[in-house]
Amino acid sequence: MSGTKKVGSAGRFGARYGLKIRRRVAAVEAKMRQKHVCPVCGRRAVKRISTGIWQCTKCGAIFAGGAYLPVTPAGKVARRIME
């Protein structure tokens, strides 16, 4: 079963867990599945390999990031401090 119009990919849960939770899951999954900017080459070509591991499809760079997004708020702060 694919998604539904209201909750997209979270439609796989059917009527379980409540609409608010399913909408939240759908929003996180949509952000996770889109292409992200590579920190090495700057191209929008980063895809998630597994939990917290991201790879650029153009330059092949593999790096660790957040579970659902390649850059977390804490990671942004740490990078700013290091620079």
Curated annotation (Swiss-Prot):
Can you supply one Gene Ontology CC term for this chain's record?
A: ribonucleoprotein complex
Q: Which Pfam families match?
A: Ribosomal_L37ae
Its cofactor is:
Zn(2+)
Q: Which Gene3D superfamilies match?
A: 2.20.25.30
The UniProt note on the cofactor reads as follows: Binds 1 zinc ion per subunit.
Q: InterPro entries under this entry?
A: Ribosomal_eL37/eL43, Ribosomal_eL43, Ribosomal_protein_eL43, Ribosomal_zn-bd
Binding residues for Zn(2+): 38, 41, 56, 59
Keywords, comma-separated and alphabetical: Metal-binding, Ribonucleoprotein, Ribosomal protein, RNA-binding, rRNA-binding, Zinc, Zinc-finger
Q: Name one GO biological process term.
A: translation
- One GO MF term: large ribosomal subunit rRNA binding
ZnF (C4-type) intervals: 38-59
Q: NCBIfam families of this UniProt entry?
A: eL43_euk_arch (TIGR00280), PRK03976.1 (NF003058)
Cite the record's note on assembly.
Answer: Part of the 50S ribosomal subunit.
The role this protein plays is: Binds to the 23S rRNA.
Name the protein family. Answer: Belongs to the eukaryotic ribosomal protein eL43 family. Putative zinc-binding subfamily.
What PANTHER family does UniProt report for this protein, alphabetically?
60S RIBOSOMAL PROTEIN L37A, LARGE RIBOSOMAL SUBUNIT PROTEIN EL43
Could you identify this protein by its name?
Large ribosomal subunit protein eL43
